[in-house]
UniProtKB/Swiss-Prot annotation:
Lineage summary: Eukaryota, Metazoa, Chordata, Craniata, Vertebrata
Primary subcellular site in the record, as a coarse category: cytoplasm
GO terms of molecular function: aryl sulfotransferase activity; cholesterol sulfotransferase activity; sulfotransferase activity
Binding site for substrate: 107-109
Key words, A-Z: Cytoplasm, Lysosome, Mitochondrion, Phosphoprotein, Transferase
Residues annotated for 3'-phosphoadenylyl sulfate binding in this entry: 49-54, 131, 139, 194, 228-233, 256-260
Protein name listed in UniProt: Sulfotransferase 1C2
Coiled coil (UniProt feature): none
Tissue: Highly expressed in stomach and kidney.
Amino acid sequence: MALTPELSRQTKLKEVAGIPLQAPTVDNWRQIQTFEAKPDDLLICTYPKSGTTWIQEIVDMIEQNGDVEKCRRTIIQHRHPFIEWARPPQPSGVDKANEMPAPRILRTHLPTQLLPPSFWTNNCKFLYVARNAKDCMVSYYHFYRMSQVLPEPGTWDEYFETFINGKVSWGSWFDHVKGWWEIRDKYQILFLFYEDMKRNPKHEIQKVMQFMGKNLDEDVVDKIVLETSFEKMKENPMTNRSTAPKSILDQSISPFMRKGTVGDWKNHFTVAQNERFDEIYKQKMGRTSLNFSMEL
């Protein structure tokens, strides 16, 4: 059956505590909030389009001791359940997580205040990756364009306003990143920067390895650096979402793995938008000790 625009795009976002989320996620909120984390869970946390798939593949390669074939056992979105995912009649992210044996590696885009409380009470490990706001905004725009489960983003200029006002799915980039940054010393949180991962992947991968309590030989780490490069992952059907149905991701509009660079925002921001964004950034982020690289 051909998908009509009404069926192909679930355009409505709903809110939980002022945070816009996809409607099926909000409809399934009770199951998400009562999710039972386990003490040995590792939760990968990101704002959308901040290197989620990249860090997932790095973590999986470390967990599998650099065994490429084991990392190809299934597509990446099946390896690490996305806890807030809900799209009936498919099993929810919570359903999939509950079926997994321990130790589990899970993922989320939720801000700190919406995370199921059991993650905090069980003192789980959290791996957070932050990406500079300008590149994140651009990447999320192209994802919005191709995603069939998010609202139409409109023109770049229209989307620019939506993003800076925190009206995109999962809410404000500013609040999300600040929220995780401010609690990084209170819990077992490894806070990484996308730009550092691009600048020196081996160094950042070694940090992840130590955080996971693994000790791999240098040649294995070098192999992980190679296998998790953007070029390799873009061609890997286990990571490039090429198996996702067009009714969810339409990659004829924009590829899921598009550029993976630092500084692509310069190809989208007008001078006026850049000046305005910098002013908003100062207002929202001026009191934090967070520092991002806008280019390499």
